[in-house]
Protein backbone atom coordinates (compact mmCIF):
# COMPACT_ATOMS: atom_id res chain seq x y z
CA UNK A 1 0.00 0.00 0.00
CA UNK A 2 2.77 2.43 0.88
CA UNK A 3 4.51 1.90 -2.47
CA UNK A 4 1.30 2.80 -4.30
CA UNK A 5 0.91 5.90 -2.17
CA UNK A 6 4.50 6.89 -2.82
CA UNK A 7 4.08 6.53 -6.58
CA UNK A 8 1.01 8.73 -6.40
CA UNK A 9 2.95 11.30 -4.41
CA UNK A 10 5.75 11.35 -6.97
CA UNK A 11 3.24 11.62 -9.78
CA UNK A 12 1.59 14.60 -8.08
CA UNK A 13 4.72 16.63 -8.84
CA UNK A 14 4.25 16.15 -12.57
CA UNK A 15 3.13 19.06 -14.68
CA UNK A 16 4.09 20.98 -17.78
CA UNK A 17 5.56 24.43 -18.29
CA UNK A 18 6.58 26.14 -21.50
CA UNK A 19 9.96 24.45 -21.38
CA UNK A 20 9.32 21.12 -19.69
CA UNK A 21 8.44 17.79 -21.25
CA UNK A 22 6.40 14.97 -19.75
CA UNK A 23 9.64 13.48 -18.47
CA UNK A 24 11.40 16.54 -17.11
CA UNK A 25 8.34 17.70 -15.21
CA UNK A 26 8.63 14.55 -13.11
CA UNK A 27 11.77 15.87 -11.46
CA UNK A 28 10.55 17.68 -8.42
CA UNK A 29 9.37 14.83 -6.23
CA UNK A 30 10.97 15.80 -2.96
CA UNK A 31 10.55 12.68 -0.90
CA UNK A 32 13.96 11.42 0.06
CA UNK A 33 12.93 8.31 1.97
CA UNK A 34 11.74 5.03 0.57
CA UNK A 35 8.61 3.27 1.81
CA UNK A 36 10.38 0.00 1.14
CA UNK A 37 12.63 0.77 4.10
CA UNK A 38 10.67 3.17 6.25
CA UNK A 39 7.19 1.65 6.34
CA UNK A 40 5.88 1.45 9.87
CA UNK A 41 2.48 -0.08 9.23
CA UNK A 42 1.70 -2.33 12.15
CA UNK A 43 4.67 -1.35 14.29
CA UNK A 44 2.81 1.07 16.54
CA UNK A 45 3.82 4.39 14.96
CA UNK A 46 1.14 6.91 15.90
CA UNK A 47 2.09 9.73 13.58
CA UNK A 48 3.36 13.17 14.56
CA UNK A 49 2.05 16.72 14.87
CA UNK A 50 4.45 18.60 12.59
CA UNK A 51 3.22 19.93 9.25
CA UNK A 52 6.45 19.02 7.50
CA UNK A 53 7.76 20.92 4.47
CA UNK A 54 7.65 19.20 1.08
CA UNK A 55 6.15 16.06 2.59
CA UNK A 56 2.94 14.24 1.73
CA UNK A 57 0.34 14.14 4.49
CA UNK A 58 0.30 10.35 4.63
CA UNK A 59 3.99 10.35 5.52
CA UNK A 60 3.18 11.83 8.94
CA UNK A 61 0.72 9.06 9.68
CA UNK A 62 2.08 6.01 7.84
CA UNK A 63 5.84 6.49 7.91
CA UNK A 64 8.07 6.98 10.90
CA UNK A 65 10.39 9.85 9.97
CA UNK A 66 14.12 9.50 9.80
CA UNK A 67 15.15 11.31 12.99
CA UNK A 68 18.72 12.59 12.94
CA UNK A 69 20.15 13.15 16.41
CA UNK A 70 23.73 14.27 15.87
CA UNK A 71 26.34 15.01 13.24
CA UNK A 72 30.08 14.82 12.95
CA UNK A 73 32.04 15.90 9.90
CA UNK A 74 30.43 14.45 6.77
CA UNK A 75 28.27 12.01 8.75
CA UNK A 76 24.93 12.12 10.55
CA UNK A 77 23.53 9.65 13.08
CA UNK A 78 19.88 8.73 13.49
CA UNK A 79 17.84 7.97 16.61
CA UNK A 80 18.48 4.24 16.15
CA UNK A 81 22.25 4.63 16.13
CA UNK A 82 22.73 4.28 12.37
CA UNK A 83 25.55 6.26 10.76
CA UNK A 84 25.11 7.82 7.32
CA UNK A 85 27.34 9.68 4.91
CA UNK A 86 25.24 12.79 4.25
CA UNK A 87 25.77 13.44 0.55
CA UNK A 88 23.34 16.36 0.42
CA UNK A 89 24.93 18.27 3.32
CA UNK A 90 21.53 18.62 4.98
CA UNK A 91 19.79 20.58 2.24
CA UNK A 92 22.79 21.66 0.14
CA UNK A 93 23.96 23.72 3.11
CA UNK A 94 26.18 22.21 5.85
CA UNK A 95 29.29 23.08 3.88
CA UNK A 96 31.62 22.64 6.86
CA UNK A 97 29.98 19.43 7.99
CA UNK A 98 28.60 18.70 11.42
CA UNK A 99 29.78 19.97 14.80
CA UNK A 100 32.53 22.30 13.61
CA UNK A 101 33.80 23.53 17.02
CA UNK A 102 34.70 27.02 15.82
CA UNK A 103 31.14 27.67 14.67
CA UNK A 104 29.70 26.28 17.89
CA UNK A 105 32.03 28.53 19.89
CA UNK A 106 31.14 31.58 17.79
CA UNK A 107 27.45 31.00 18.51
CA UNK A 108 28.02 30.35 22.22
CA UNK A 109 30.25 33.38 22.69
CA UNK A 110 27.74 35.66 20.99
CA UNK A 111 24.81 34.18 22.93
CA UNK A 112 26.65 34.92 26.14
CA UNK A 113 27.57 38.45 25.06
CA UNK A 114 24.50 39.71 23.17
CA UNK A 115 21.91 37.10 22.13
CA UNK A 116 19.78 39.60 20.21
CA UNK A 117 19.50 43.16 19.10
CA UNK A 118 17.67 44.53 16.07
CA UNK A 119 19.02 46.57 13.17
CA UNK A 120 16.10 49.02 12.85
CA UNK A 121 16.23 52.84 13.20
CA UNK A 122 19.99 53.23 12.92
CA UNK A 123 20.62 50.80 15.78
CA UNK A 124 22.44 47.52 15.34
CA UNK A 125 25.09 45.19 16.74
CA UNK A 126 28.69 44.80 15.60
CA UNK A 127 28.47 41.35 13.92
CA UNK A 128 26.09 42.43 11.11
CA UNK A 129 28.25 45.46 10.35
CA UNK A 130 31.38 43.31 10.17
CA UNK A 131 29.66 40.63 8.11
CA UNK A 132 28.40 43.14 5.55
CA UNK A 133 31.96 44.42 5.06
CA UNK A 134 33.31 40.88 4.70
CA UNK A 135 30.73 39.90 2.10
CA UNK A 136 31.33 42.99 -0.01
CA UNK A 137 35.06 42.27 0.14
CA UNK A 138 34.64 38.58 -0.67
CA UNK A 139 32.33 38.93 -3.69
CA UNK A 140 34.62 40.10 -6.50
CA UNK A 141 32.74 39.17 -9.70
CA UNK A 142 31.27 42.67 -9.62
CA UNK A 143 31.47 45.48 -7.09
CA UNK A 144 28.72 45.41 -4.48
CA UNK A 145 27.67 48.40 -2.39
CA UNK A 146 25.33 47.27 0.37
CA UNK A 147 24.14 44.08 2.09
CA UNK A 148 20.64 43.44 3.43
CA UNK A 149 20.25 40.50 5.80
CA UNK A 150 17.43 37.97 5.76
CA UNK A 151 16.80 34.62 7.43
CA UNK A 152 16.83 32.37 4.36
CA UNK A 153 17.42 32.16 0.64
CA UNK A 154 13.68 32.40 0.04
CA UNK A 155 13.55 35.71 1.92
CA UNK A 156 16.65 36.90 0.08
CA UNK A 157 15.07 36.32 -3.33
CA UNK A 158 11.77 37.76 -2.14
CA UNK A 159 13.62 40.88 -0.98
CA UNK A 160 15.41 41.17 -4.32
CA UNK A 161 12.10 41.66 -6.11
CA UNK A 162 11.05 44.38 -3.66
CA UNK A 163 14.41 46.10 -4.12
CA UNK A 164 14.08 45.96 -7.91
CA UNK A 165 10.59 47.47 -7.73
CA UNK A 166 11.72 50.15 -5.28
CA UNK A 167 14.62 50.99 -7.58
CA UNK A 168 12.48 51.33 -10.70
CA UNK A 169 9.83 53.37 -8.90
CA UNK A 170 12.56 55.73 -7.72
CA UNK A 171 13.71 56.14 -11.33
CA UNK A 172 10.19 56.95 -12.50
CA UNK A 173 9.64 53.60 -14.22
CA UNK A 174 6.52 52.27 -12.47
CA UNK A 175 5.73 49.79 -15.25
CA UNK A 176 9.14 48.08 -15.23
CA UNK A 177 8.19 45.35 -12.75
CA UNK A 178 8.16 41.94 -14.45
CA UNK A 179 10.69 39.32 -13.40
CA UNK A 180 11.88 36.54 -15.71
CA UNK A 181 13.05 33.24 -14.24
CA UNK A 182 13.99 29.88 -15.74
CA UNK A 183 11.63 26.96 -16.02
CA UNK A 184 12.67 24.17 -13.67
CA UNK A 185 14.74 26.43 -11.40
CA UNK A 186 14.02 26.66 -7.66
CA UNK A 187 14.28 30.00 -5.85
CA UNK A 188 12.37 29.42 -2.61
CA UNK A 189 8.89 29.00 -1.20
CA UNK A 190 7.63 32.43 -0.13
CA UNK A 191 4.85 33.95 -2.22
CA UNK A 192 7.31 35.67 -4.55
CA UNK A 193 10.17 33.17 -4.52
CA UNK A 194 7.78 30.27 -5.16
CA UNK A 195 6.42 32.22 -8.11
CA UNK A 196 9.97 32.64 -9.40
CA UNK A 197 10.53 28.91 -9.08
CA UNK A 198 9.79 27.27 -12.42
CA UNK A 199 8.35 24.11 -10.90
CA UNK A 200 4.65 23.26 -11.29
CA UNK A 201 4.48 21.65 -7.84
CA UNK A 202 5.38 25.00 -6.27
CA UNK A 203 2.36 26.61 -7.90
CA UNK A 204 -0.32 23.92 -7.77
CA UNK A 205 -3.23 24.88 -5.47
CA UNK A 206 -1.36 27.97 -4.24
CA UNK A 207 -2.72 30.27 -7.00
CA UNK A 208 0.81 30.84 -8.25
CA UNK A 209 2.82 32.06 -10.04
CA UNK A 210 2.10 35.74 -9.50
CA UNK A 211 1.18 37.51 -12.74
CA UNK A 212 4.36 39.63 -12.79
CA UNK A 213 6.57 36.51 -13.05
CA UNK A 214 7.48 35.07 -16.45
CA UNK A 215 9.42 31.91 -17.21
CA UNK A 216 11.86 31.30 -20.02
CA UNK A 217 13.65 28.16 -21.20
CA UNK A 218 15.36 25.69 -18.92
CA UNK A 219 19.03 25.51 -20.03
CA UNK A 220 19.23 21.71 -19.99
CA UNK A 221 21.06 20.73 -23.16
CA UNK A 222 20.67 16.95 -22.79
CA UNK A 223 16.91 17.24 -22.53
CA UNK A 224 16.03 20.21 -24.68
CA UNK A 225 18.78 20.40 -27.29
CA UNK A 226 17.45 19.80 -30.80
CA UNK A 227 18.80 16.96 -32.98
CA UNK A 228 22.14 18.04 -34.41
CA UNK A 229 22.18 21.25 -32.36
CA UNK A 230 25.58 22.03 -30.82
CA UNK A 231 25.75 23.18 -27.21
CA UNK A 232 26.70 26.74 -28.19
CA UNK A 233 23.85 26.81 -30.71
CA UNK A 234 21.47 25.70 -27.97
CA UNK A 235 22.68 28.60 -25.81
CA UNK A 236 22.16 31.00 -28.71
CA UNK A 237 18.60 29.75 -29.22
CA UNK A 238 17.79 30.22 -25.53
CA UNK A 239 19.23 33.74 -25.54
CA UNK A 240 17.17 34.53 -28.65
CA UNK A 241 14.06 33.17 -26.92
CA UNK A 242 14.76 35.37 -23.90
CA UNK A 243 15.11 38.41 -26.15
CA UNK A 244 11.87 37.55 -27.93
CA UNK A 245 10.09 37.23 -24.58
CA UNK A 246 11.36 40.64 -23.47
CA UNK A 247 10.26 42.20 -26.77
CA UNK A 248 6.86 40.52 -26.56
CA UNK A 249 6.25 41.84 -23.05
CA UNK A 250 7.85 45.21 -23.77
CA UNK A 251 11.34 46.05 -22.44
CA UNK A 252 9.81 48.92 -20.49
CA UNK A 253 7.90 46.35 -18.39
CA UNK A 254 10.70 43.83 -17.71
CA UNK A 255 12.74 44.63 -14.61
CA UNK A 256 15.01 41.67 -13.88
CA UNK A 257 16.14 38.17 -14.75
CA UNK A 258 17.02 35.70 -11.98
CA UNK A 259 19.14 32.57 -12.34
CA UNK A 260 21.39 30.27 -10.36
CA UNK A 261 24.88 29.78 -11.83
CA UNK A 262 23.99 26.07 -11.77
CA UNK A 263 20.35 25.10 -11.30
CA UNK A 264 20.34 23.22 -8.00
CA UNK A 265 17.14 21.84 -6.51
CA UNK A 266 15.52 21.89 -9.95
CA UNK A 267 17.79 19.09 -11.13
CA UNK A 268 21.49 20.08 -10.86
CA UNK A 269 21.76 21.55 -14.35
CA UNK A 270 25.05 23.25 -15.29
CA UNK A 271 24.61 25.89 -18.00
CA UNK A 272 25.52 25.07 -21.59
CA UNK A 273 28.69 26.60 -23.00
CA UNK A 274 28.42 30.36 -23.69
CA UNK A 275 24.98 30.52 -22.02
CA UNK A 276 25.58 33.29 -19.51
CA UNK A 277 27.69 35.31 -21.94
CA UNK A 278 24.77 35.41 -24.37
CA UNK A 279 22.08 35.88 -21.73
CA UNK A 280 23.91 38.84 -20.17
CA UNK A 281 24.25 40.51 -23.57
CA UNK A 282 20.46 40.41 -23.94
CA UNK A 283 19.89 41.77 -20.44
CA UNK A 284 22.29 44.66 -20.98
CA UNK A 285 20.66 45.49 -24.31
CA UNK A 286 17.26 46.02 -22.69
CA UNK A 287 18.33 47.41 -19.30
CA UNK A 288 17.18 44.32 -17.41
CA UNK A 289 18.86 43.66 -14.06
CA UNK A 290 20.54 40.32 -13.32
CA UNK A 291 19.85 38.66 -9.96
CA UNK A 292 22.34 35.87 -9.28
CA UNK A 293 20.87 33.28 -6.92
CA UNK A 294 24.03 31.97 -5.23
CA UNK A 295 22.17 30.32 -2.35
CA UNK A 296 23.54 26.88 -3.28
CA UNK A 297 26.59 27.78 -5.35
CA UNK A 298 28.15 30.31 -2.99
CA UNK A 299 31.23 29.77 -0.79
CA UNK A 300 33.14 27.13 -2.72
CA UNK A 301 30.57 24.60 -3.90
CA UNK A 302 31.76 24.75 -7.53
CA UNK A 303 35.48 25.08 -6.79
CA UNK A 304 35.37 28.88 -6.88
CA UNK A 305 34.23 31.12 -4.04
CA UNK A 306 31.06 31.94 -5.98
CA UNK A 307 29.42 30.48 -9.06
CA UNK A 308 29.56 33.92 -10.65
CA UNK A 309 33.36 33.62 -10.66
CA UNK A 310 33.24 30.36 -12.58
CA UNK A 311 30.81 31.51 -15.27
CA UNK A 312 31.90 35.16 -15.54
CA UNK A 313 28.55 36.43 -14.33
CA UNK A 314 28.38 40.16 -13.54
CA UNK A 315 25.18 40.41 -11.48
CA UNK A 316 23.46 43.53 -10.23
CA UNK A 317 22.15 41.74 -7.15
CA UNK A 318 23.21 38.51 -5.42
CA UNK A 319 21.26 36.22 -3.08
CA UNK A 320 23.11 34.21 -0.42
CA UNK A 321 22.14 31.78 2.35
CA UNK A 322 22.83 28.11 3.22
CA UNK A 323 26.65 27.90 3.38
CA UNK A 324 26.78 31.50 4.59
CA UNK A 325 26.65 30.03 8.10
CA UNK A 326 27.15 26.42 7.02
CA UNK A 327 23.46 26.23 8.05
CA UNK A 328 24.35 26.25 11.74
CA UNK A 329 21.97 29.17 12.24
CA UNK A 330 19.43 30.69 9.84
CA UNK A 331 20.74 33.59 7.79
CA UNK A 332 20.48 34.90 4.25
CA UNK A 333 21.68 38.02 2.50
CA UNK A 334 21.10 40.16 -0.55
CA UNK A 335 24.11 41.92 -2.04
CA UNK A 336 23.24 45.10 -3.92
CA UNK A 337 25.43 46.87 -6.47
CA UNK A 338 26.26 50.55 -5.86
CA UNK A 339 24.16 51.60 -8.86
CA UNK A 340 21.08 50.22 -7.14
CA UNK A 341 21.97 50.88 -3.51
CA UNK A 342 22.65 54.56 -4.26
CA UNK A 343 19.17 54.93 -5.74
CA UNK A 344 17.61 53.09 -2.79
CA UNK A 345 19.55 55.37 -0.43
CA UNK A 346 18.31 58.50 -2.18
CA UNK A 347 14.71 57.30 -2.38
CA UNK A 348 14.62 56.35 1.29
CA UNK A 349 15.76 59.87 2.16
CA UNK A 350 12.83 61.31 0.20
CA UNK A 351 10.30 58.97 1.81
CA UNK A 352 11.76 59.09 5.30
CA UNK A 353 13.12 55.54 5.64
CA UNK A 354 13.61 52.24 3.80
CA UNK A 355 10.47 50.41 4.87
CA UNK A 356 11.62 46.82 4.53
CA UNK A 357 13.12 44.48 7.12
CA UNK A 358 12.62 41.55 9.46
CA UNK A 359 12.90 41.23 13.22
CA UNK A 360 15.84 38.91 12.74
CA UNK A 361 17.57 40.85 9.93
CA UNK A 362 21.23 40.86 10.93
CA UNK A 363 20.66 38.67 13.99
CA UNK A 364 23.91 39.00 15.98
CA UNK A 365 24.27 35.26 16.65
CA UNK A 366 23.68 34.34 13.01
CA UNK A 367 26.10 37.01 11.85
CA UNK A 368 28.76 35.94 14.36
CA UNK A 369 28.56 32.35 13.12
CA UNK A 370 28.62 33.49 9.49
CA UNK A 371 31.70 35.61 10.14
CA UNK A 372 33.50 32.59 11.57
CA UNK A 373 32.38 30.45 8.63
CA UNK A 374 33.83 32.98 6.19
CA UNK A 375 37.11 32.93 8.11
CA UNK A 376 37.23 29.14 7.80
CA UNK A 377 36.49 29.24 4.07
CA UNK A 378 39.43 31.58 3.60
CA UNK A 379 41.89 30.04 6.08
CA UNK A 380 41.34 26.49 4.84
CA UNK A 381 40.98 27.66 1.22
CA UNK A 382 37.82 25.62 0.83
CA UNK A 383 37.31 26.51 -2.87
CA UNK A 384 40.80 25.16 -3.65
CA UNK A 385 40.06 21.99 -1.68
CA UNK A 386 36.86 21.50 -3.68
CA UNK A 387 38.73 22.13 -6.93
CA UNK A 388 41.28 19.49 -5.93
CA UNK A 389 38.87 16.81 -4.78
CA UNK A 390 35.90 17.33 -7.12
CA UNK A 391 37.46 15.56 -10.15
CA UNK A 392 37.66 12.40 -8.03
CA UNK A 393 33.99 12.86 -7.14
CA UNK A 394 32.73 13.75 -10.63
CA UNK A 395 34.82 11.21 -12.53
CA UNK A 396 34.13 8.48 -10.00
CA UNK A 397 30.37 8.82 -10.39
CA UNK A 398 30.44 9.48 -14.12
CA UNK A 399 32.35 6.22 -14.61
CA UNK A 400 28.98 4.50 -14.10
CA UNK A 401 27.23 6.61 -16.78
CA UNK A 402 27.22 3.68 -19.21
CA UNK A 403 24.63 1.86 -17.11
CA UNK A 404 21.54 0.92 -19.10
CA UNK A 405 19.29 2.66 -16.56
CA UNK A 406 21.18 5.98 -16.44
CA UNK A 407 20.15 8.70 -18.86
CA UNK A 408 22.59 11.38 -17.76
CA UNK A 409 25.02 12.14 -14.97
CA UNK A 410 25.81 15.85 -14.73
CA UNK A 411 27.47 18.20 -12.32
CA UNK A 412 30.32 20.52 -11.46
CA UNK A 413 32.43 20.83 -8.33
CA UNK A 414 30.77 19.06 -5.42
CA UNK A 415 27.33 19.19 -7.01
CA UNK A 416 26.00 16.28 -9.04
CA UNK A 417 22.85 14.51 -10.20
CA UNK A 418 22.14 11.20 -11.87
CA UNK A 419 18.96 10.99 -13.91
CA UNK A 420 17.54 7.54 -14.53
CA UNK A 421 15.91 6.94 -17.91
CA UNK A 422 14.63 4.01 -19.90
CA UNK A 423 16.83 3.28 -22.93
CA UNK A 424 19.05 6.23 -21.85
CA UNK A 425 16.62 8.65 -23.50
CA UNK A 426 15.43 11.96 -22.03
CA UNK A 427 12.04 11.29 -23.59
CA UNK A 428 11.60 7.74 -22.31
CA UNK A 429 11.15 7.83 -18.53
CA UNK A 430 10.61 4.78 -16.40
CA UNK A 431 7.04 4.17 -15.22
CA UNK A 432 6.39 6.30 -12.14
CA UNK A 433 5.18 3.30 -10.18
CA UNK A 434 8.57 1.61 -10.54
CA UNK A 435 10.18 4.32 -8.42
CA UNK A 436 13.64 3.67 -9.85
CA UNK A 437 15.31 6.60 -8.10
CA UNK A 438 13.52 5.61 -4.88
CA UNK A 439 14.95 2.11 -5.18
CA UNK A 440 18.42 3.55 -5.64
CA UNK A 441 17.98 5.86 -2.66
CA UNK A 442 16.85 2.95 -0.49
CA UNK A 443 19.85 0.86 -1.57
CA UNK A 444 22.18 3.74 -0.65
CA UNK A 445 20.52 4.07 2.72
CA UNK A 446 20.97 0.36 3.41
CA UNK A 447 24.68 0.89 2.87
CA UNK A 448 24.95 3.95 5.11
CA UNK A 449 24.58 6.83 2.66
CA UNK A 450 21.81 9.40 2.21
CA UNK A 451 21.05 10.91 -1.19
CA UNK A 452 18.23 13.18 -2.26
CA UNK A 453 15.64 11.56 -4.50
CA UNK A 454 14.07 14.02 -6.93
CA UNK A 455 11.60 12.24 -9.18
CA UNK A 456 13.67 10.27 -11.70
CA UNK A 457 16.93 11.61 -10.27
CA UNK A 458 19.17 11.45 -7.28
CA UNK A 459 21.18 14.50 -6.27
CA UNK A 460 24.34 14.89 -4.24
CA UNK A 461 25.87 18.01 -2.77
CA UNK A 462 28.19 16.73 -0.02
CA UNK A 463 29.98 18.79 2.64
CA UNK A 464 32.88 20.76 1.20
CA UNK A 465 35.24 19.28 3.80
CA UNK A 466 35.06 15.75 2.40
CA UNK A 467 38.31 13.82 2.32
CA UNK A 468 39.51 11.73 -0.62
CA UNK A 469 38.80 8.62 1.43
CA UNK A 470 35.21 9.74 2.00
CA UNK A 471 34.78 10.48 -1.70
CA UNK A 472 36.07 7.00 -2.53
CA UNK A 473 33.59 5.52 -0.04
CA UNK A 474 30.77 7.53 -1.60
CA UNK A 475 31.65 6.30 -5.08
CA UNK A 476 31.85 2.71 -3.85
CA UNK A 477 28.40 2.83 -2.25
CA UNK A 478 27.00 4.50 -5.37
CA UNK A 479 28.30 1.62 -7.49
CA UNK A 480 26.87 -1.05 -5.19
CA UNK A 481 23.48 0.69 -5.02
CA UNK A 482 23.43 1.09 -8.80
CA UNK A 483 24.09 -2.61 -9.32
CA UNK A 484 21.24 -3.53 -6.97
CA UNK A 485 18.95 -1.05 -8.73
CA UNK A 486 19.85 -2.46 -12.15
CA UNK A 487 18.88 -5.92 -10.92
CA UNK A 488 15.55 -4.65 -9.62
CA UNK A 489 14.82 -2.80 -12.87
CA UNK A 490 15.61 -5.98 -14.82
CA UNK A 491 12.99 -7.79 -12.73
CA UNK A 492 10.43 -5.05 -13.35
CA UNK A 493 11.16 -5.07 -17.08
CA UNK A 494 10.71 -8.83 -17.27
CA UNK A 495 7.38 -8.60 -15.45
CA UNK A 496 6.22 -5.85 -17.79
CA UNK A 497 6.86 -8.11 -20.78
UniProtKB/Swiss-Prot annotation:
Keywords: Aminotransferase, Mitochondrion, Pyridoxal phosphate, Transferase, Transit peptide. It comes from Oryza sativa subsp. indica (Rice). It is an enzyme of class 2 (transferase). One of its GO terms (biological process) is biotin biosynthetic process. Its EC number is 2.6.1.96. Its main location: mitochondrion. This is Probable gamma-aminobutyrate transaminase 2, mitochondrial. It catalyses: 4-aminobutanoate + pyruvate = succinate semialdehyde + L-alanine; 4-aminobutanoate + glyoxylate = succinate semialdehyde + glycine.
Amino acid sequence: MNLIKHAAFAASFQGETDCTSHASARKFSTSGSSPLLDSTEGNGFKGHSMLAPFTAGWHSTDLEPLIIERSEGSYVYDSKGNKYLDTLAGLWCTALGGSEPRLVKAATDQLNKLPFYHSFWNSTAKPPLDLAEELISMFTAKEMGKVFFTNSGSEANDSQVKLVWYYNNALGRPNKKKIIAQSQAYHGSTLISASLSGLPAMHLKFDLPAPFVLHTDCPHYWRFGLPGEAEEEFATRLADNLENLILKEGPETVAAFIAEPVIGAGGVIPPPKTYFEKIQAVLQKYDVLFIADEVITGFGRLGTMFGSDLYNIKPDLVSLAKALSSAYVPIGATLVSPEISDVVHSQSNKIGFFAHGFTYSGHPVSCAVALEALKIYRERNIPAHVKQISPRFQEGIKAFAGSSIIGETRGVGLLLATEFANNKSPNDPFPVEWGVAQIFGAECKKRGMLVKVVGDEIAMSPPLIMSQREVDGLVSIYGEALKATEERVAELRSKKK
